[in-house]
Swiss-Prot record:
Glycosyltransferase catalyzing the last biosynthesis step of the N-glycan biosynthesis. The keyword DNA repair does not apply. It is an enzyme of class 2 (transferase). It comes from Sulfolobus acidocaldarius (strain ATCC 33909 / DSM 639 / JCM 8929 / NBRC 15157 / NCIMB 11770). Belongs to the glycosyltransferase group 1 family. Glycosyltransferase 4 subfamily. Disruption phenotype: Reduced molecular weights of the S-layer glycoprotein and archaellins due to a change in the N-glycan composition. The tribranched hexasaccharide glycan of S-layer glycoprotein is a pentasaccharide that lacks a terminal hexose residue. InterPro entries: AGL16-like, Glyco_trans_1, Glyco_trans_4-like_N, Glycosyltransferase_grp1. One of its GO terms (molecular function) is glycosyltransferase activity. Keywords: Glycosyltransferase, Transferase. This is Archaeal glycosylation protein 16. The lineage of its organism: Archaea, Thermoproteota, Thermoprotei, Sulfolobales, Sulfolobaceae.
Amino acid sequence: MYKVWMLTPLFLPVRGGTEVHVFNLSRELVKMSIDVEVHTTRDTYTEREKLIPFEIMDGIKVVRHKRTWIYRDSPSVLHFHNLGRKFSTWNLYTFLFFSLPSVEAPLVMTPHHIFVSDQGRVINWLKRNIGKRVDKLIAVSEWEKEEMINLGYDGSKIVVIPNGVDDMAFNYPKSEGFEDYLLYIGRISPEKNQLFAIECIKNLNVKLILIGQVRDKDYLEKIMTRVSELGLEDKVRYLGVVTEEEKYSLMDKSLAVILTSDIEAEGIVIKEAMVRGVPVIVGNKAKVLSTIVKDGVNGFVISSCQDLKDAVEKLRDPKVRKEIGENNISISREWRWRNVSLKVLELYKSLS
């Protein structure tokens, strides 16, 4: 049987963009009778060795290691994901693994933007060595591919396969009703830059709801302190982690989904909102977001609080919301994970 190892420092129940990507890709491959093992750590964002060593999740074998993975069993392909979460024993072993003279299995890597982020001279050098050693690199956007090529990675090795969107985003019944709030979905961490939205809300007649796991407790404390300093307790709510059903219901009823991250590989929550026909507002710092969202067409791209105020005022017009929502549904029809997984499997088999 064709066997794929997915290697990722963190995995579900940790829910970030990379973790959700690996789960959905693995689940679809299992449906195609591919034997998939996810190798990961037992860590969460905030606790070490918290999770059980082994489980089967939707047909996916999940093997959680105490410190790092060990190469064995000669899988058909090794697919690496996102070494950028933290420089750990896991990452060190992976870097050393790539220095081995020969490995039977083809090596594929989806960097999830880490190859285009500056992590210091030593880490950048190690990443470039990985780029030379892998057989293929998967970029999730044309922007990421162009950035990698500009940094010296071999363009002939890079294939663009965008992130998919979970079938539930397409199929879950639409929640009726409308409430006047912006919804910010993302882990609580400085690079997600929720503080920008909070600073803007003080001068806007709209509420802000935040959902997502806490990766950085200090940043959550900073957020809540700033909310208190600005007297926004009635306008800003942090709901923590919610179910997928609750997430989509919150999306459907919102004025817009907002994301003002400093950096993103693609911004899967923005794509989920587009599938639901919900308007989106994105910051211009994470350049990839403006390749998905065209200002005034299927959402708004902002760089300041005034831009956000202007976007909110435009979205108060039901005709504008309806037109943007319809544009988003039209754009997003090809984003089902099965389509994405077929492209990835085709790539694997081209290396066999």
